[in-house]
């Protein structure tokens, strides 16, 4: 005797209602989209009175060698800070993933501690450390290594070092996530086959940690090129970068259209770097050398 079995229809998956995202959309529009559109609007004026539309501000910036030099110095600073953060952050992230569980908590506290303090406080700490009467110069003079204080502050190098320390958590945290997602069996298999620790690192660990490396690099680069406080206090205004240049044009000169154009050009350059790094990440995704 044949029996007919009735298979219940699958219940449609019901996601959260769209209105739950409304507060986030309003926040994004009010504090990101609208200010960005206003910035574009102001930059597209040829005069400070905002009466004549045009692209004269962009042509003025791109046609001046000094302006292009400021842009190039800012991009180079971002690259230096990113490399310094990577060279110090990768060993720290690797140390965290290899540390026993009881040590990971204190290590994580040390990593995120800079994020719990104001950037102004951290920057002033570097001013105290690198000043002519600062900790470094005082220690070197007490040891008899130098006769006169070294000029450590108000240099591009001091700005890069200070920013690398301040932005370090932005590099370390994505690297920790990427390193912890690597299957430990891959390293063990590589070592068992006689690859050695260095070869295993270069062939297995580094390629598989590339997503975290690229994410951290983008965060550090984007944050460092726009770090007005650190660039100004540690640099002393003697070396002009794009954020301080915007401040000069807007506050000191009252040339808001030109300042807005500077901001938009910096944004375009940062977005170009983001697109290029994302393209590199897609090409290198999943590549592990044999």
Predicted feature descriptions by range:
Residues 13-48, 61-180, 204-228, 235, ...:
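Membrane-water interface segments at the C-terminal ends of transmembrane alpha-helices
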Residues 53-62:
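A short amphipathic helical element positioned immediately N-terminal to and/or at the very start
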Residues 190:
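The alpha-helix within a helix-turn-helix
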Residues 1-14:
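Short, Lys/Arg-rich, polar N-terminal cytosolic tail immediately upstream
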Residues 47-53, 228-254, 290:
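Glycine-rich helix-loop "coupling/hinge" segments at transmembrane-helix boundaries
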Residues 4, 280-290:
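Short cytosolic juxtamembrane segments of multi-pass membrane proteins
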Residues 193-195, 207:
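Glycine/proline-centered hinge or cleavage motifs at structural transition points of membrane proteins
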Residues 182-186:
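Short glycine/proline-centered loop/turn elements that form peptide/ligand docking sites
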């Amino acid at each position: 005797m044949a029996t007919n079995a009735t298979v219940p229809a699958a219940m449609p998956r019901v996601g959260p209602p769209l209105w739950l995202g409304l507060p986030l959309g309003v926040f994004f529009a009010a504090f990101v989209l609208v200010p960005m559109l206003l910035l574009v609007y102001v930059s597209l004026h040829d005069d400070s009175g905002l009466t004549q539309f045009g692209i004269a501000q962009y042509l003025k910036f791109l046609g001046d060698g000094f302006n292009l030099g400021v842009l190039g110095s800012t991009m180079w600073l971002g690259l230096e800070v990113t490399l310094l953060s990577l060279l110090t952050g990768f060993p720290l992230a690797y140390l965290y993933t290899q540390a026993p569980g009881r040590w990971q908590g204190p290590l994580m506290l040390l990593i995120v501690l800079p994020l719990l303090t104001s950037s102004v406080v951290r920057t002033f700490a570097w001013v105290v450390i690198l000043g002519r009467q600062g900790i470094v110069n005082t220690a070197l003079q007490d040891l008899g290594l130098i006769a006169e204080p070294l000029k450590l502050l108000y240099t591009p190098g001091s700005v890069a070092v200070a920013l690398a320390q301040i932005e370090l958590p932005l590099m370390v945290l994505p690297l920790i996530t990427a390193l912890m997602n690597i299957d430990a069996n891959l390293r063990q298999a590589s070592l068992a086959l006689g690859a050695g620790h260095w070869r295993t690192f270069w062939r297995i660990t580094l390629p598989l940690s590339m997503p975290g490396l690229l994410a951290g690099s983008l965060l550090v680069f984007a944050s460092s090129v726009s770090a007005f406080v650190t660039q100004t206090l540690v640099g002393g205004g003697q070396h002009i970068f794009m954020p301080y240049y915007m401040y000069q044009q807007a506050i000191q000169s009252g040339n808001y259209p030109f300042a807005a154009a500077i901001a938009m050009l910096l944004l375009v350059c940062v977005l170009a770097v983001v697109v290029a790094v994302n393209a590199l990440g897609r090409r290198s995704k999943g590549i592990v050398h044999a």
